[in-house]
């Protein structure tokens, strides 16, 4: 699951920063 979260963070960095 960690890999999926990492990929999501890379694809949607603005959401992670929010």
Swiss-Prot record:
Modifications after synthesis and translation: Glycosylated.
Site feature: Reactive bond: 3-4
Keywords recorded for this protein, A-Z: Blood coagulation, Fibrinolysis, Glycoprotein, Hemostasis, Protease inhibitor, Secreted, Serine protease inhibitor
GO molecular function: serine-type endopeptidase inhibitor activity
Chain positions of site Reactive bond for chymotrypsin: 2-3
Entry's family note: Belongs to the serpin family.
Quaternary organization: Interacts with MASP1.
Descriptive protein name: Plasma protease C1 inhibitor
